[in-house]
Amino acid sequence: MGLPWYRVHTVVLNDPGRLLSVHIMHTALVAGWAGSMALYELAVFDPSDPVLDPMWRQGMFVIPFMTRLGITNSWGGWSITGGTITNPGIWSYEGVAGAHIVFSGLCFLAAIWHWVYWDLEIFCDERTGKPSLDLPKIFGIHLFLSGVACFGFGAFHVTGLYGPGIWVSDPYGLTGKVQPVSPAWGAEGFDPFVPGGIASHHIAAGTLGILAGLFHLSVRPPQRLYKGLRMGNIETVLSSSIAAVFFAAFVVAGTMWYGSATTPIELFGPTRYQWDQGYFQQEIYRRISAGLAENLSLSEAWSKIPEKLAFYDYIGNNPAKGGLFRAGSMDNGDGIAIGWLGHPVFRDKEGRELFVRRMPTFFETFPVVLVDGDGIVRADVPFRRAESKYSVEQVGVTVEFYGGELNGVSYSDPATVKKYARRAQLGEIFELDRATLKSDGVFRSSPRGWFTFGHASFALLFFFGHIWHGARTLFRDVFAGIDPDLDAQVEFGAFQKLGDPTTKRQAV
């Protein structure tokens, strides 16, 4: 049977045994990829600096997902939060990866068994003697089992009743750790940034799934509904399954890109909106104001700012700055961050503090403009020196650093001042090592960007797939050109055709 590549799935159309086999093989491939990818990432991952070189800067993709579910230790003797450990236990990163690979191998063998032994009694309709599947019953079974898994995850794993809990952090991604989470049953449970909503929603959705599964196991669909939705056709199952998958893909693309409790910034990197809104900058200034109110000097106040918080306030960590098709991790772009140089404070010769206007997300280049506290432009780096009025040289701008490696150092040399003004456009200033990885200086996106792009793209494709297969199953008689209720002998081109009421027809 010479089938074109896009029609090969017809070989499992009326063969339940081999339909099961190919799905088990698909599970084997998915689990095998997950385990293998985890081992590859562990081989290249450097856990030595969780503050300035976290997993998302190194381009890790599956390690963040394991971590958010409660895995933090490695058989290599390190912990994701820093430091060393002596007894990581069986459920380390390597343990989870190994479990996926073993599971993949077992699924591979099961797929082969079901391909060879396809003609099982369980798939045979005792009334007709032909292979058939009771699809509404199978739907009920799957709904019930997925409901049990969903409820179990929310009630046991997330709450810590039997499991580690999940990754929980503060709003600024500084204190993250794995901990048990209590369900949030009030209105706060609908806040996407409240971890308790993860527990309560899984418990609620799982309960609903269990009840719905039992309903579909005990109640048969009405005949009109069964026929109207083509519930006996396996392509109906394909269409509705694709709908479930693309809907989920759109949802997770949103929760990843806009941020939520399920996508902590310590594991996936900050969102672009945190740069756009000056989210971390505002928190830093709030802490500085609080420090000054406690009679600390500027230098002391800035020295108390966590390096982790300052690093989030850097445009190179904005996932929207990397192009969609620039391969590689963030470290391959602007380099590996080594240390925070400190916060530069610019002043003109009259002593006014000046603020460098920050680069918006979608600009590659941006004019260097310094404004005072009232937003009035006081200095810039001009494009045409002949027409300049506010150049650094003319205004006499100086820069002094507070906190970081250059704490207390000041510069009045215009070339140096301009250098740091340009760098201040990009947020807090860091020393970056571009030699080790031969980084090219062009920003890359974080796993947050890749995940969003991949899931949004495939969701769109799967949406079209849902429409396609839904239309095929609902209008199969129209596409075939023959009425499914027709039992008269027909000859193509001579007898009953679509829209020809004169041809012979005998209704059932």
Swiss-Prot record:
Cofactor binding mode and count: Binds multiple chlorophylls. PSII binds additional chlorophylls, carotenoids and specific lipids.
Membrane topology (UniProt): Multi-pass membrane protein
GO molecular function: chlorophyll binding; electron transporter, transferring electrons within the cyclic electron transport pathway of photosynthesis activity
GO CC terms of this entry: chloroplast thylakoid membrane; photosystem II
Keywords, in A-Z order: Chlorophyll, Chloroplast, Chromophore, Membrane, Photosynthesis, Photosystem II, Plastid, Thylakoid, Transmembrane, Transmembrane helix
Presence of the UniProt keyword Plastid in the record: yes
SUPFAM superfamilies found in the cross-reference section: Photosystem II antenna protein-like
Subunit-structure text: PSII is composed of 1 copy each of membrane proteins PsbA, PsbB, PsbC, PsbD, PsbE, PsbF, PsbH, PsbI, PsbJ, PsbK, PsbL, PsbM, PsbT, PsbX, PsbY, PsbZ, Psb30/Ycf12, at least 3 peripheral proteins of the oxygen-evolving complex and a large number of cofactors. It forms dimeric complexes.
Protein name: Photosystem II CP47 reaction center protein
Species this chain originates from: Lemna minor (Common duckweed)
Lineage: Eukaryota, Viridiplantae, Streptophyta, Embryophyta, Tracheophyta
